[in-house]
Amino acid sequence: MTDTTVEAPATPRLKVKYNEQIIPELEKEFKYSNPMQVARVQKVVVSMGVGAAARDSKLIEGAVKDLTLITGQKPKITKAKKSVAQFHLREGQAIGAYVTLRGDRMWEFLDRLLTLALPRIRDFRGINGHQFDGQGNYNFGLTEQSMFHEIDPDSIDHVRGMDITVVTSTKDDKEAYALLKHLGFPFKEN
């Protein structure tokens, strides 16, 4: 008989950094008595609105394909709730897609975003540090999908932007800012 051992998948390096370095730093900074009080990233939502899909239904397929390549997870398609004649939109028509990332996939996506994608943006000076929603969540947008290595620039049919929401466990923007700064988010210095 042969012994077969199954190796556990490697822990994402950003998660290791969070557990080993960031938690102790935030405990000192905010004087927490319990490590469970430290802010943590709960989920990341990546969404792509495809308004032009109202006229051409094939555009949504490209958005789904791009989001699948970028996040490693199949997106959920969002549909119009109401018909709007001015936008040539019918109720139930596909108009966008989104992915909710949790766990290791979330950590891997954040790592790729911070180390590979954001530095590839032309004339990048940092992201705005004032886009918190008052509840400890951070929202920002990217203008094109080609900055991710998973997307082949030659195969892009349309340039699509995306919105990224980082949901944290804290309800305070100051704590969320400190968490994201420690994780490596390149905020602009104002």
UniProtKB/Swiss-Prot annotation:
GO terms for cellular component: ribonucleoprotein complex; ribosome. GO terms for biological process: translation. InterPro entries: Ribosomal_uL5, Ribosomal_uL5_bac-type, Ribosomal_uL5_C, Ribosomal_uL5_dom_sf, Ribosomal_uL5_N. GO terms for molecular function: rRNA binding; structural constituent of ribosome; tRNA binding. Signal peptide: none annotated. SUPFAM superfamilies: RL5-like. It comes from the Bacteria. Pfam families: Ribosomal_L5 (PF00281), Ribosomal_L5_C (PF00673). Keywords: Ribonucleoprotein, Ribosomal protein, RNA-binding, rRNA-binding, tRNA-binding. Part of the 50S ribosomal subunit; part of the 5S rRNA/L5/L18/L25 subcomplex. Contacts the 5S rRNA and the P site tRNA. Forms a bridge to the 30S subunit in the 70S ribosome. This is one of the proteins that bind and probably mediate the attachment of the 5S RNA into the large ribosomal subunit, where it forms part of the central protuberance. In the 70S ribosome it contacts protein S13 of the 30S subunit (bridge B1b), connecting the 2 subunits; this bridge is implicated in subunit movement. Contacts the P site tRNA; the 5S rRNA and some of its associated proteins might help stabilize positioning of ribosome-bound tRNAs. Belongs to the universal ribosomal protein uL5 family. HAMAP family: Ribosomal_uL5_B (MF_01333_B). This is Large ribosomal subunit protein uL5. It comes from Bifidobacterium longum (strain NCC 2705). The gene is rplE.
